[in-house]
């Protein structure tokens, strides 16, 4: 079943229009009770939720501007955050692929991790250079 959800996240990653420094394609899906309830991918579009959580990624005293391009995980969070469900039973699957088509580390950044934890999500599965990993949040 896990491979099915990673394949769904992979399909989402192909929609990515992000062309930043890494230009990696990232897709994510949220799964609740065996069903995909939301999909997302990284994009050039900004989002206020990403902007709010970016304080976890960057020095807030810095004068540098970091555009709040939405990450795949944050797009998923924005789609499910108002649902009336037990978020501790939601699993997020994140897939990342380089522009060359090889698997890459897709561990959520500090901003996305904070958003997932704030929502009460406890389990995140993501790609690594060598396969897949599951991480449990406290």
What are the residue ranges of the model-derived segments?
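Zinc-dependent deaminase catalytic domain
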Residues: 1-138
């Amino acid at each position: 079943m896990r491979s099915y959800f990673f394949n769904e996240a992979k399909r989402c990653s192909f929609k990515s229009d992000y062309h930043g420094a890494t230009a990696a394609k990232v897709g994510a899906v949220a799964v609740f009770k065996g069903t995909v309830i939301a999909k997302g991918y990284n994009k050039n579009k900004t989002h206020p939720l990403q902007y709010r959580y970016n304080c976890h990624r960057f020095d807030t005293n810095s004068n540098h501007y970091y555009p709040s391009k939405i990450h795949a995980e944050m797009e998923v969070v924005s789609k499910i955050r108002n649902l009336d469900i037990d978020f501790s039973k939601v699993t997020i699957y994140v897939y990342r692929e380089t522009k060359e088509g090889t698997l890459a580390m897709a561990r959520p950044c500090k901003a996305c991790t904070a958003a997932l934890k704030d929502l009460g999500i406890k389990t995140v599965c993501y790609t690594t250079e060598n396969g897949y990993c599951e991480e449990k949040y406290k």
